[in-house]
Amino acid sequence: MRDGGVTIQILVVTLLHPLPRNGSRGVFVEDHIHLLRSMGHDVRVVNPLPRMPRFAEARRSTMMGVAKAPKRWMKDGAEVLSPRFFALPDHPYPRLTKWSIGRQAKTIERQLDSWRPEVILCHTLWPVAELAQNLAARWKIPWVGIVHGYDFDVALEQKSLSKHVAELSRRCDALVCASSRLSSIASKLEPSPKKLLTIPCMTEIGKEWRREVKPLSKSWKKEAIDILFPTDPRRPEKRHLLALQTGEEMEQRGWIVGITTLRHQPRNIVFDRMLVADVTLVTSKREAGPLVARESLLCGTPVVSVDVGEVKDYLPEEWVTKATPTALADGIEHALYHGWKDEISVEEKLAFSNREQVTEAWSALLSDLVS
């Protein structure tokens, strides 16, 4: 909200967003939209989707529900626009994809009727930032690119996409990265972004799920433990096999182990699973957060993780290990035996991503852009 309490009209253009058949898709973007609306802003959402046959959804869990998603639908009392664009797997023809998505600007302008934003926020640069850029140019307003991981960890490393991602990073009026690691990558781009900030995804769970992280209350190696693998095992970058190998290592040490995975569950079910789990195991190759690690800690479940994202900033050093079954098993045993022993509480460690801090950061940026 502007100084003086004036509502800002914001258009969110995002590659990921919940769909009618996939409510867990892009929940971190949905959290941001809810935050902006709670700040009093008028927010509209455009979620461009690639054209694809139903069978192609099996390639990635994030594609579930995309093929038959409606082009216009209601979410939380507000309309979501989902124009289609052409894209092939791994984007061998990026210029064709840019042209396909960029030409949707006129359609979006017509669908919004007389409503016009004062700023555009674009979650994930490739390829939807091309649409954000075209709309911003038509309306002569600023736009903000928001990087969560894919753009720099995957697209920037692909020969066919790297120059396009770098160009989009430069063209936006401000580039927001979800972690300091991503901001460090952005700062080394040539030319560098006009304005670079680090604003994490907000971490917030209801009081009914909040617990303290305590040592294991079960009998040591006599009762079964539940290890939570907090994502869809079909996503290769999450390394489900490493989690299974870690479970086998624990069993060789005398533990009775069960591993629970999460597939497209709504948020309240995810938090319930975190409450009943004895430990959360993160084995991802790439993460901006990961958000699930912070949420798990707030639910009272210890988190053992490979060194990914920002976990070193708040997890005990014994809980951040090498990406081997033995090291991860050592971390799990330490977490189960000791619980949270840091003098600084979990809430204080995660204060950088709480509602107040994230609200303040976005309020300052938006006020600066539209003033």
Feature map (PLM): residue ranges:
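Acidic anion/phosphate-binding donor-loop and adjacent secondary structure
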Residues: 155-159, 187, 202-219, 223
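Conserved donor-binding/catalytic core segment of Leloir-type glycosyltransferases
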Residues: 11, 203, 218-238, 244-247
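A charged, aromatic-enriched C-terminal amphipathic alpha-helix characteristic of glycosyltransferases
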Residues: 214-215, 237, 337-370
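Short hydrophobic beta-strand element within catalytic cores of glycosyltransferases
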Residues: 293, 302-305
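N-terminal subdomain of nucleotide-sugar transferases
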Residues: 1-68
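Donor nucleotide-sugar binding/catalytic pocket of nucleotide-sugar-dependent glycosyltransferases
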Residues: 47, 166-211
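Aromatic "clamp/platform" in nucleotide-sugar-dependent glycosyltransferases that forms part
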Residues: 285
